[in-house]
UniProtKB/Swiss-Prot annotation:
Residue numbers on the Cytoplasmic membrane side: 34-46, 103-123, 202-235, 293-328
Pfam families per UniProt: 7tm_1 (PF00001)
Keyword Nucleotide-binding: no
Positions of transmembrane segments: 11-33, 47-69, 81-102, 124-146, 177-201, 236-259, 268-292
GO biological process, one term: negative regulation of mucus secretion
Homology family: Belongs to the G-protein coupled receptor 1 family.
Protein name (record): Adenosine receptor A1
Species in which this protein is naturally found: Oryctolagus cuniculus (Rabbit)
Protein topology in the membrane: Multi-pass membrane protein
InterPro entries per the UniProt record, alphabetical: Adeno_A1_rcpt (IPR001068), Adenosn_rcpt (IPR001634), GPCR_Rhodpsn (IPR000276), GPCR_Rhodpsn_7TM (IPR017452)
Record: glycosylation sites: 159
Function statement: Receptor for adenosine. The activity of this receptor is mediated by G proteins which inhibit adenylyl cyclase.
UniProt topological domain (Extracellular) ranges: 1-10, 70-80, 147-176, 260-267
Length: 328
């Protein structure tokens, strides 16, 4: 270990590595499950795959870059900016994937009979591509000029230096807090989160109303359908809650930095907020395993088929996976 790394930094790196070691395999397992189980091929699970891809990238790319920034190497301004932007792209992709999931669940309970005609695989693919393109635009905005280059250049010139500034690479040194608060948080994080809360409230209202009507009419299949929708909606709302719980503290700290520059932010608070944002990428597979039956069964099948030391018992083949049913 290089002598320049303090004990505190070593602890930080250790926690980040642990998060990555949970996040990457867990989300790869989610993608694998959707690939092997035909019952996990509807639009919702395609959006979940998009979310899992972003979470894999957090563990495989963002966390190593965060460790690099924490060590604080000296580099050119735009090189540091390129290191800082991936987390913005992936965060935005996660938010838009969660929004797409919420809209998809709303359509499933609002227009159940027309759902498959409206939400086609092609449209779902277009929506996913649109989410990623928009995420790239939002996340790369600092590369287009909304950054701290002018301030850094002034300090660089004041020291009599010429050429592109060489700085100690830190997130707040290159990313403008005006961008993070006014554009990223107030436009692309907070409004989508509030919209998703409203959508899930409407979803729960529609499901409760349908369950009440169907129960009173003693209907079988519709009651079962909306019961399943309620269970899945609760699980996905939990994913949304965990995302908000993980990301809002860091955005609130950014607001403090912008609106109260003289306010001191305890290092432990900042690092806790960072750990929450990265740790969120490891939470989703755990929620899927405990809350969504199709995922749990498929995870067990993958484990039995590929990782157990002894052969899986007969009958653990594809026939044991949950079968896809209309509107299931």
């Amino acid at each position: 270990m290089p002598p320049s790394i303090s004990a505190f930094q070593a602890a930080y790196i250790g926690i980040e590595v642990l998060i990555a070691l949970v996040s990457v395999p867990g989300n790869v397992l989610v993608i694998w499950a959707v690939k092997v189980n035909q019952a996990l091929r509807d639009a919702t699970f395609c959006f979940i795959v998009s979310l899992a891809v972003a979470d894999v990238a957090v563990g495989a790319l963002v966390i190593p870059l965060a460790i690099l920034i924490n060590i604080g190497p000296e580099t050119y301004f735009h090189t540091c900016l390129m290191v800082a932007c991936p987390v913005l792209i992936l965060t935005q992709s996660s938010i838009l994937a969660l929004l797409a999931i919420a809209v998809d669940r709303y359509l499933r309970v609002k227009i159940p009979l027309r759902y498959k005609a409206v939400v086609t695989p092609r449209r779902a693919a277009v929506a996913i591509a649109g989410c990623w393109i928009l995420s790239l635009v939002v996340g790369l905005t600092p590369m287009f000029g909304w950054n701290n280059l002018r301030e850094v250049q002034r300090a660089w010139a004041a020291n009599g230096s010429v050429g592109e500034p060489v700085i100690k690479c830190e997130f707040e040194k290159v990313i403008s807090m005006e961008y993070m608060v006014y554009f990223n948080f107030f436009v692309w994080v907070l409004p989508p989160l509030l919209l998703m809360v409203l959508i899930y409230l409407e979803v729960f209202y529609l499901i409760r109303r349908q369950l009440s009507k169907k129960a009173s009419a003693s209907s079988g299949d519709p009651h079962k359908y909306y019961g399943k929708e309620l269970k899945i909606a609760k699980s996905l709302a939990l994913i949304l809650f965990l995302f908000a719980l993980s990301w809002l503290p860091l955005h609130i700290l950014n607001c403090v930095t912008l609106f109260c520059p003289s306010c001191q932010k305890p290092s432990i608070l900042v690092y806790t907020a960072i750990f929450l944002t990265h740790g969120n990428s490891a939470m989703n597979p755990i929620v899927y395993a405990f809350r969504i039956h199709k995922f749990r069964v498929t995870f067990l099948k993958i484990w039995n088929d590929h990782f157990r030391c002894r052969p899986a018992p007969a009958g653990d083949g594809d026939e044991d996976l949950p079968e896809e049913k209309p509107n299931d």
